[in-house]
C-alpha cells in the first residue's frame, strides 16, 4: 500500500516574523499563498509561487516563500487567523480584545469587531462565510455577522449558565452543514459542543486533566480532537457526543489539525510534531527542528496547518520561523 511509505520531509524554512507564530491559515483552493499571525502584533501574507530551492548551510534550510504583505493594526499579540473560503479576506483575533477582517488585495482592515472584554484567543468562519465565531479570555464565545455585529454571546454574565468557567482558548465550526455546530475548548478542562441554530449546549465533553489549548474538527465533521496541558489528545464522536479513544502525545499540546485527505491527526507539542495514523493509532512520524537547541532556548512548534490538497504541512515556531514539510514517497502507480 502506497500510504505505508509516505513521510514528511523538510522542504524549507520561511523567515519574516520576529516572535512566536501563533496560527497559519491556508486557502481552500490551494492558491500559492498562506497567512500567518504572530506575537509580533502583525500578520504576514506569504507568496509561495516561486519556492527558492537554494539549500544553504543547514540541510533543507532553503527559503521557501517570501512575505509580500504585512498586515498591521492590532495593538497586541495576534493569536489566531483564518481565511474566507474565496481567499480574499483574512480574519484575525488579538490580545487587544478585537477581531479584524482584512482585505488581502489591499492589506487594509475592512471591519473591526469590538465586544470582548479581554484577549481574543480564537476565531473561525462558518462554511458559508456568513458567520464568525470568536473565543476569549473573558470566558465567552461570540457569534458575529460579517458586518461586525455581535449576534449572540455564549457564557459570561449575560450568556446563560451553560458557558465555560475558564478562558475559552479555541473555537471551531464543524464543516457538517446538516448539523450546524460549534466546538469550543477551555481552561476549565472541558470541550463543549454547541448547536449553532439556537446557540444551546449540545454536549459537554469531559476527560482532560488540564486546560484545553486546541480543538480540531475532522474534514467530514464526524470527529473532534482536543488537547492541551495534560499531553493527551482525546478523540470524540461529534454526533454521539462521546469519547472514542485517546492518543498520548507526551507533552503539552499547542495545536491540532487533521489531514484533509489522509486519516492522520497532527499535534504540535512542546517536544515535537507528532503525526498519528488514526486507523492504527500509531505515530507515523515525529518531526523535530533540525537545529540543535540550547537548554535556555525553547524551540517548538506552536501552530500547524495543512495545504488544502494535503501535500504540505506548514508549522509555525516559537522563534518566528515557519517550516514547510512536504509529503514524499508517493506511489504513482494507478
From Swiss-Prot:
GO molecular function: protein kinase C binding; ribosome binding; translation regulator activity
Family: Belongs to the WD repeat G protein beta family. Ribosomal protein RACK1 subfamily.
Repeat positions for WD: 16-47, 73-103, 115-145, 163-195, 207-237, 248-277, 296-326
Quaternary structure note: Interacts with RAC1, RAC3, RAC6, RAR1, SGT1 and RBOHB. Homodimer and heterodimer with RACK1B.
Gene Ontology biological process terms in this record: defense response to fungus; negative regulation of translational frameshifting; positive regulation of respiratory burst; rescue of stalled ribosome; signal transduction
Cellular component GO terms, alphabetical: cytoplasm; cytosol; nucleus; plasma membrane; ribonucleoprotein complex; ribosome
Pfam families found in the cross-reference section: WD40
Tissue: Widely expressed.
Compartment(s): Cytoplasm; Cell membrane
Lineage: superkingdom: Eukaryota
Keywords: Cell membrane, Cytoplasm, Membrane, Plant defense, Repeat, Ribonucleoprotein, Ribosomal protein, Transducer, WD repeat
Keyword Membrane annotated: yes
Stated name of the protein: Small ribosomal subunit protein RACK1z
Function: Component of the RACK1 regulatory proteins that functions in innate immunity by interacting with multiple proteins in the RAC1 immune complex. Acts as a positive regulator of reactive oxygen species (ROS) production and is required for resistance against rice blast (M.grisea) infection.
Keyword Cell membrane among UniProt keywords: yes
Predominant cellular place of this UniProt entry's protein: cytoplasm
Signal peptide residue numbers: none
PROSITE patterns in the cross-refs: WD_REPEATS_1, WD_REPEATS_2, WD_REPEATS_REGION
Species the sequence originates in: Oryza sativa subsp. japonica
Stated induction or repression of this protein's expression: By auxin, abscisic acid (ABA) and jasmonic acid (JA).
Amino acid at each position: 500500500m502506497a500510504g505505508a511509505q509516505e513521510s514528511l520531509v523538510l522542504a524549507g524554512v520561511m523567515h519574516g516574523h520576529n516572535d512566536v507564530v501563533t496560527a497559519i491559515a491556508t486557502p481552500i483552493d490551494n492558491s500559492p499563498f498562506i497567512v500567518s499571525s504572530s506575537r509580533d502584533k502583525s500578520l504576514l501574507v506569504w507568496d509561495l509561487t516561486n519556492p527558492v530551492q537554494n539549500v544553504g548551510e543547514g540541510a533543507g534550510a532553503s527559503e521557501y516563500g517570501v512575505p509580500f504583505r504585512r498586515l498591521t493594526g492590532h495593538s497586541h499579540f495576534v493569536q489566531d487567523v483564518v481565511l474566507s473560503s474565496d481567499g480574499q479576506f483574512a480574519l484575525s483575533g488579538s490580545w487587544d480584545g478585537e477581531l479584524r477582517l482584512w482585505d488581502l488585495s489591499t492589506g487594509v482592515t475592512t471591519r473591526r469587531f469590538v465586544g470582548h472584554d479581554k484577549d481574543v484567543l480564537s476565531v473561525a468562519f462558518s462554511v458559508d462565510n456568513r458567520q464568525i465565531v470568536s473565543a476569549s479570555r473573558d470566558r465567552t464565545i461570540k457569534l458575529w455577522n460579517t458586518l461586525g455585529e455581535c449576534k449572540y454571546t455564549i457564557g459570561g454574565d449575560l450568556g446563560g449558565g451553560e458557558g465555560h468557567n475558564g478562558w475559552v482558548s479555541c473555537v471551531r465550526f464543524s464543516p457538517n452543514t446538516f448539523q450546524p455546530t460549534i466546538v469550543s475548548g477551555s481552561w476549565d478542562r472541558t470541550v463543549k459542543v454547541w448547536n449553532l441554530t439556537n446557540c444551546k449546549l449540545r454536549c459537554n465533553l469531559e476527560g482532560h486533566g488540564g486546560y484545553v489549548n486546541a480543538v480540531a474538527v475532522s474534514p467530514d465533521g464526524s470527529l473532534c480532537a482536543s488537547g492541551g496541558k495534560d499531553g493527551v489528545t482525546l478523540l470524540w464522536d461529534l454526533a454521539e457526543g462521546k469519547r472514542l479513544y485517546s492518543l498520548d502525545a507526551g507533552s503539552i499540546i499547542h495545536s491540532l489539525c487533521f489531514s484533509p485527505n489522509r486519516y492522520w491527526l497532527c499535534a504540535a507539542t512542546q517536544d515535537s510534531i507528532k503525526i498519528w495514523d488514526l486507523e492504527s493509532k500509531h505515530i507515523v512520524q515525529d518531526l523535530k527542528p533540525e537545529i540543535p537547541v540550547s537548554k535556555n532556548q525553547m524551540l517548538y512548534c506552536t501552530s500547524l496547518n495543512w495545504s488544502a490538497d494535503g501535500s504540505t504541512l506548514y508549522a509555525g515556531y516559537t522563534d518566528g520561523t515557519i517550516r514547510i514539510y512536504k509529503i514524499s514517497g508517493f506511489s504513482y502507480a494507478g
